[in-house]
């Protein structure tokens, strides 16, 4: 493996690409081949200080720019993203590993997030009520917070950052972005395209790194709010540390999404839907289907079809269109998932399809689609977020048992039901504990103009991302009562 021509990514601070203050770096491999494609700096406190200081200086001017003018930058950015959509998709596949089809889908979802940001003037409109008392009018106004920060994961290196900084910036804030050290090249490209539309320096800053950068942002007195997406332990840490320091925090965390399959479902469509929800993006997404609760009446027929279709899924380099499952992000993650599979077998689950047997011509971090039957809630593979193409089947008596099973999980991000019964779907919608619910919808992640967040250990905070929640998170309200004598 040669690394002689592999570049080291830089930080974007105060309108320029600058080297990190620390010499420490981490290799960024292509998950499909294991070959180094970049080095990412592990920036430190000094880099965070410089980025926040730049954002704070820029805020004093940026907050006075009229909101329609701020939004015009988003319209221009939108065109840049559309013009470069294929390049962005190829870059996602290169450093994340997901298939090119999934990468193109992510690019489209990212574009939709920026489309939402172009509606900021409408979303920031306040409310007014005249004559609330004799000669007194009342109104509500929205203002930006100041310097805000975003900490984003590797699994959606385009969509999640675009949940955050376009909306925050259009609302009048300035932004410090800390993306995953596993996918720095896509972040570099997103910032470069934003720079090309002429965004004033300091409005958007990028600091690469790991825990030192996270702690620097959490503890910096000039950072007003932090948006985070990642694992449950880190989300809990970010929320507790950030709020203890007086910051507004939204922390989207882990998931164990369940799909409920009833006897009256459209069986073939349900099987294909579950396969896409469970195994696309190699299962490395917080909305992946991880458990199917299928009623006994249809269990054998459903599992027979699901097993046959799962065995057909090809595994390999995501740049090739014919592959359905790409590599996992790192060898260390693959090793962890393999241990979960071993635990499933040891604890009594029936392994119907073993993804450990997947082979590829390239030396990447490959794990094929894996399917378990006869899983119980006492098993580790039911309890933990695996973040992998591993699907567990639990057989249940009826809808009530399926709902109770789903609600037993400590996670509550998304849940889906497959049924032809409106009555059953309505009951499921009302009884299930999940932030996002799908009815014959494979992945219940709505468009960007709806809010996105889970419940229980899947989310820490009050306001989710996107939609009305998004604009409320990045702004504060002022309630004004006024009377005039002249």
From Swiss-Prot:
<dbReference type="GO" id="GO:0006574">
    <property type="term" value="P:valine catabolic process"/>
</dbReference>
<dbReference type="Pfam" id="PF00171">
    <property type="entry name" value="Aldedh"/>
</dbReference>
<comment type="subunit">
    <text>Homotetramer.</text>
</comment>
<keyword id="KW-0520">NAD</keyword>
<feature type="binding site">
    <location>
        <position position="154"/>
    </location>
    <ligand>
        <name>NAD(+)</name>
    </ligand>
</feature>
<keyword id="KW-0560">Oxidoreductase</keyword>
<dbReference type="InterPro" id="IPR016162">
    <property type="entry name" value="Ald_DH_N"/>
</dbReference>
<dbReference type="InterPro" id="IPR010061">
    <property type="entry name" value="MeMal-semiAld_DH"/>
</dbReference>
<dbReference type="InterPro" id="IPR023510">
    <property type="entry name" value="MSDH_GmP_bac"/>
</dbReference>
<dbReference type="GO" id="GO:0019310">
    <property type="term" value="P:inositol catabolic process"/>
</dbReference>
<dbReference type="InterPro" id="IPR015590">
    <property type="entry name" value="Aldehyde_DH_dom"/>
</dbReference>
<feature type="binding site">
    <location>
        <position position="182"/>
    </location>
    <ligand>
        <name>NAD(+)</name>
    </ligand>
</feature>
<protein>
    <recommendedName>
        <fullName>Malonate-semialdehyde dehydrogenase 2</fullName>
        <ecNumber>1.2.1.27</ecNumber>
    </recommendedName>
</protein>
<feature type="binding site">
    <location>
        <position position="181"/>
    </location>
    <ligand>
        <name>NAD(+)</name>
    </ligand>
</feature>
<feature type="binding site">
    <location>
        <position position="231"/>
    </location>
    <ligand>
        <name>NAD(+)</name>
    </ligand>
</feature>
<dbReference type="GO" id="GO:0006210">
    <property type="term" value="P:thymine catabolic process"/>
</dbReference>
<feature type="active site" description="Nucleophile">
    <location>
        <position position="286"/>
    </location>
</feature>
<feature type="binding site">
    <location>
        <position position="385"/>
    </location>
    <ligand>
        <name>NAD(+)</name>
    </ligand>
</feature>
<dbReference type="InterPro" id="IPR016160">
    <property type="entry name" value="Ald_DH_CS_CYS"/>
</dbReference>
<comment type="function">
    <text>Catalyzes the oxidation of malonate semialdehyde (MSA) and methylmalonate semialdehyde (MMSA) into acetyl-CoA and propanoyl-CoA, respectively. Is involved in a myo-inositol catabolic pathway. Bicarbonate, and not CO2, is the end-product of the enzymatic reaction.</text>
</comment>
<dbReference type="GO" id="GO:0004491">
    <property type="term" value="F:methylmalonate-semialdehyde dehydrogenase (acylating, NAD) activity"/>
</dbReference>
<feature type="binding site">
    <location>
        <position position="178"/>
    </location>
    <ligand>
        <name>NAD(+)</name>
    </ligand>
</feature>
<dbReference type="GO" id="GO:0018478">
    <property type="term" value="F:malonate-semialdehyde dehydrogenase (acetylating) activity"/>
</dbReference>
<dbReference type="InterPro" id="IPR016163">
    <property type="entry name" value="Ald_DH_C"/>
</dbReference>
<comment type="similarity">
    <text>Belongs to the aldehyde dehydrogenase family. IolA subfamily.</text>
</comment>
<dbReference type="InterPro" id="IPR016161">
    <property type="entry name" value="Ald_DH/histidinol_DH"/>
</dbReference>
<comment type="pathway">
    <text>Polyol metabolism; myo-inositol degradation into acetyl-CoA; acetyl-CoA from myo-inositol: step 7/7.</text>
</comment>
